[in-house]
Amino acid sequence: MATAPSPTTMGTYSSLISTNSFSTFLPNKSQLSLSGKSKHYVARRSSISCKATNNNNSNNQNEQQEESSRLLGKLDRRNILIGLGGLYGATTLDRKPFAFADPIAPPDLTTCKPAEITPGGSETVPCCPPVTTKIKTFKPDLSIPLRTSPAAHQVTDEYLAKFKKAQAAMRALPDDDPRSMVQQAKVHCAYCNGAYPQVGFTDNDIQVHFSWLFFPFHRMYLYFYERILGKLIDDPTFALPYWNWDSPVGFPIPDIYTDTSSPLYDQYRNADHQPPVLVDLSYGGKDDDVDEQTRIDENLAIMYRQMVSGAKTPDLFFGHAYRAGNLNTGKYPGTIENMPHNNIHIWVGDPSQTHQEDMGNFYSAGRDPLFYAHHANVDRMWNIWKTLGGKRKDITDTDWLDAEFLFYDENAELVRVKVRDSLEPEKQLRYNYEPVSLPWLFTKPTARKTKNKTKAKVAATQLTSKFPATLVEVTTVEVARPKPRKRSKKEKVDEEELLIIKDIEFEGTEAVKFDVFINDDAESLSRRDKSEFAGSFVHVPQGKTTKAKTKTNLKLGITDLLEDLGAEDDSSVLVTLVPRVSNSPITIGGFKIEYSS
């Protein structure tokens, strides 16, 4: 078994790079409506029947088997939680062992195993933390001074000197110190690349991506990382900076991370994406040949879509529910996690490295100090989202609120935290963000076509009617709308219309991206600042413990999009998928439109 090289380069930084379950979806043989033999296909606004077939029954059986496994696993898991004395028993004293709740439990560090980089464990990396039998329960400390995170592109010289001193001190700690840069980077590796089995469900690994755990896990990860840095320079007011990639002034990588003699530098970054190059929030592995203004327009429209029009509900913003015993398949990410979070990881990572290290792979992302500035802005998006009104509020499900993680704090003590400990950062965690302008808030995508010219033209040969299908070229399908009528304003507020792309199957150790367009011309697709662009599916390479392919879903809110396109009365929509990046086949299981409250 090959082992990935240890991150010895983390100690040096002077070298420079040369340059909940779904209902039925489309059956195997879809009841799609195709126009005859003309050169182009003009969308017919007729009703399309999508009836369940054996394929869907199989999907339901798989879901039922997973639920049965979870129910059986509960007894085993609760026996473990009750019976273990030492390490894990110490972490579960306040649990209600017979309650019918299934939050993800914190990992048992004694069961940690090498993290996977390639399918089936052919290549691994050691990411396990030091083990201790003493675990504290997190309690907010209101005596901590309030810390304000600055925008990285406008920090003062005084702040930068302090930040560099703290980062250098963290790098200088022994590798086996849980507060060291080496160990802090391993935190992300262990939780994201299959190092921790779920307690009571040892065949299922803990995965903090593609679900509602994404935001709270990374918030608490950054919290303890920041507290360690502050302790190392004896400054409790120190706060990490955020990379303001949601605004044109912050689109380039902040200059403070590009000095090759600085402890903030990482040598494994894409040499073609150094300042003053603007970040591409829709990047998937290949650079687009667009001018600077187009990049700005597209980035701002993407932010509006991911924060406003496409993220009206907690379900869309946070992602799929993830409970104890759930498999790491069939989930879907929230809007910001999927895009631009994933895109930025890939954009920064070094394509000349085997696994796109450092930022381009979850196992190595934490080795780059820029990772923490990136995630500080991701966290900032959570704060901002909750101020935008409507249903944009935190999840109230106790399986989310009581999900738990383990982190080492600034005193090298292991701490157990719950998601509910992270919901009010200023009050519970004593930090906030320096306010800056939000230009994306006023950059709503506009329709490419006028409302009286919305019929899309698609070559007949590009229409696909059988699913599952392999996505190897531009593919268009007609999908029925259950409510083919213009809904009232209240109805739109009460229920968001969703396009669901189900059972997206691919090799999870590779980067994947495809774009989604609605009612657009397949032979001449819109720019990403147009309403016809519905979004993207983006995957950052990550390890796994089996050779099975990764399977997930994508949910896109399309209420505003259909309104912009004048398609609210249409009985169906044309959905076009455009593969952008993948070194192995992508399989699409089916499509459906449904409504979510």
Swiss-Prot record:
Record-listed E.C. numbers: 1.10.3.1
Record key words, sorted: Chloroplast, Copper, Disulfide bond, Metal-binding, Oxidoreductase, Plastid, Thioether bond, Thylakoid, Transit peptide
Regulation of activity: Activated in the presence of substrate at low pH. Specific activity fluctuates during fruit ripening, starting at immature-green stage, reaching a peak at the breaker stage, followed by a sharp decrease until the half-ripe stage to remain stable during the following development stages. Triggered by CuSO(4) and by low concentrations of SDS. Repressed by several inhibitors including 4-hexylresorcinol, ascorbic acid, benzoic acid, kojic acid, glutathione (reduced form), L-cysteine and sodium metabisulfite.
Free-text remark on how the cofactor is bound: Binds 2 copper ions per subunit.
Chain positions recorded as Cu cation A binding sites: 188, 209, 218
Temperature notes for this entry: Optimum temperature is 45 degrees Celsius with catechol as substrate. Completely inactivated after heating at 70 degrees Celsius for 10 min.
Enzyme class label: oxidoreductase
Pfam family, one: PPO1_DWL
Domain of life: Eukaryota
GO process terms (BP): pigment biosynthetic process
Amino acids binding Cu cation B: 341, 345, 375
Cofactor(s) named in the record: Cu(2+)
Disulfide-bond pairs as recorded: 112-128, 127-189
pH dependence (record): Optimum pH is 4.5 with catechol as substrate.
Transit peptide: 1-49, 50-101
Matching Gene3D superfamilies: Di-copper center containing domain from catechol oxidase (1.10.1280.10)
The protein's name: Polyphenol oxidase latent form, chloroplastic
Gene giving rise to this polypeptide: PPO
